[in-house]
């Protein structure tokens, strides 16, 4: 049996330099190789003409550059593109490209499904299978960057920002998310500014501390409720890491970070008559008073079977005004890609659920239906 080849997309620059040293080559070859892969989208070692033939032969024998394939894509009326990415064994994750006037953001997945069970999120209802590898995470960026590059006649902009806000909880896959983000930031990788790479978390506090020690990127935190009682229902990880503990972890991260410019983004999905009252706005403002932040109010994007509805514009407006009375910076997120189920909370993919969460839900729904009938 032939030895399995090393997928170079699994290695950041430190890993590539170690590989070249082990091969008896100069470490700077890693810089050359990364430039070919990430700046030019090249996968054929023979095309890398500033690398000598002997080394190219060594690389061909031992290594490969393999990104997960794009299975299909849909384009929204607003220009948003949702990609289905094949990660093997009949499973897909979803990646979303969001073009704007001054930037183009790619929303990247970190897990096949999600290990958390946020009750307002479509991904969470699909259950969980596994963590994505480094090559499967950075491969989403690589594939879409090449797709956009080959589709220049359509006018899509190159990727300027990456947000780890797709399927999964990034901080439950730090071992692979950190090297992938290293490649995004590396001058020989995608060369993105640390302020243009954002990781989002629902509150896995010990992992947030580890991230702060390893990397400096922008942070977005999923709060979604102004108190523990409601957050225990909406974001069940809160039962393990309640708000006070989460906010303390956020402040520790801010203290270490330059990328956040002294504050984080608070994500708050607006659920009709669940978390959107003026009293809850006052409660949220008081909760966040000691944590430097800007608050991103996200109109809920319904999905089939969702138990929640979207807050009305008037309720969102009232909620926003209360927060601003406390001197908080508030942004109401513009919904993008909802006509192709690419908006926040709508990503589902194709998952073999190891948790059996979706099957249990279907069983419960069928039992309810039988009872009603």
Swiss-Prot record:
Its EC number is 2.1.1.192. It catalyses: adenosine(2503) in 23S rRNA + 2 reduced [2Fe-2S]-[ferredoxin] + 2 S-adenosyl-L-methionine = 2-methyladenosine(2503) in 23S rRNA + 5'-deoxyadenosine + L-methionine + 2 oxidized [2Fe-2S]-[ferredoxin] + S-adenosyl-L-homocysteine; adenosine(37) in tRNA + 2 reduced [2Fe-2S]-[ferredoxin] + 2 S-adenosyl-L-methionine = 2-methyladenosine(37) in tRNA + 5'-deoxyadenosine + L-methionine + 2 oxidized [2Fe-2S]-[ferredoxin] + S-adenosyl-L-homocysteine. Residues 100-339 form the Radical SAM core domain. It comes from Shewanella sediminis (strain HAW-EB3). Belongs to the radical SAM superfamily. RlmN family. The lineage of its organism: Bacteria, Pseudomonadati, Pseudomonadota, Gammaproteobacteria, Alteromonadales. PROSITE patterns: RADICAL_SAM. Specifically methylates position 2 of adenine 2503 in 23S rRNA and position 2 of adenine 37 in tRNAs. m2A2503 modification seems to play a crucial role in the proofreading step occurring at the peptidyl transferase center and thus would serve to optimize ribosomal fidelity. Its cofactor is [4Fe-4S] cluster. Signal peptide: none annotated. It is an enzyme of class 2 (transferase). GO terms for cellular component: cytoplasm. GO terms for biological process: rRNA base methylation; tRNA methylation. Disulfide bonds join 107-344. This is Dual-specificity RNA methyltransferase RlmN. [4Fe-4S] cluster binds at residues 114, 118, 121. S-adenosyl-L-methionine binds at residues 168-169, 200, 222-224, 301.
């Amino acid at each position: 049996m032939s030895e399995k080849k090393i997928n170079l997309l699994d290695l950041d620059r430190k890993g590539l330099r170690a590989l070249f040293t082990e091969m008896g080559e100069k470490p700077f070859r890693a810089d050359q190789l990364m430039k070919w892969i990430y700046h030019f989208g090249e996968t054929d070692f023979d095309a890398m003409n500033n690398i000598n033939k002997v080394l190219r032969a060594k690389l061909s024998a031992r290594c490969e550059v393999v990104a997960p394939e794009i299975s299909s894509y849909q384009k929204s009326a607003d220009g948003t593109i949702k990609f289905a990415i094949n990660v093997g064994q009949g499973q897909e994750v979803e990646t979303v490209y969001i073009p704007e006037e001054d930037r183009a953001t790619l929303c990247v997945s970190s897990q096949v499904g999600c290990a958390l069970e946020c009750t307002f999120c479509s991904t969470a209802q699909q259950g969980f299978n596994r963590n994505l590898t480094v090559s499967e995470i950075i491969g989403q960026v690589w594939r879409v960057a090449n797709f956009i590059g080959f589709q220049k006649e359509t006018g899509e902009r190159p990727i300027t920002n990456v947000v780890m806000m797709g399927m999964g909880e990034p901080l439950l896959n730090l071992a692979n998310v950190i090297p992938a983000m290293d490649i995004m930031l590396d001058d020989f990788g995608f060369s993105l500014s640390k302020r243009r790479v954002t990781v989002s978390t629902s509150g896995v506090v010990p992992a947030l501390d580890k991230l702060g020690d390893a990397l400096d990127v922008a942070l977005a935190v999923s709060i979604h409720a102004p108190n523990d009682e409601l957050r225990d229902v909406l974001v069940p990880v809160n039962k393990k890491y309640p708000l006070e503990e989460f906010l303390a972890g956020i402040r520790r991260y801010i203290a270490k970070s330059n990328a956040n410019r002294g504050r984080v983004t608070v994500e708050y999905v607006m659920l009709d008559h669940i978390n959107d009252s003026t009293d809850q706005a006052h409660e949220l403002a008081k909760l966040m008073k000691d944590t430097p932040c800007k608050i991103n109010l996200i109109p809920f994007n319904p999905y089939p079977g969702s138990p929640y509805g979207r807050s009305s514009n008037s309720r969102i407006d009232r909620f926003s005004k209360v927060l601003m009375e406390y001197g908080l910076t508030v942004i109401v997120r513009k919904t993008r890609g909802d006509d192709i189920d690419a908006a926040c909370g709508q990503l589902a993919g194709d998952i073999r659920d190891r948790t059996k969460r979706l099957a249990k839900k279907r069983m419960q729904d069928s039992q309810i239906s039988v009872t009603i009938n």
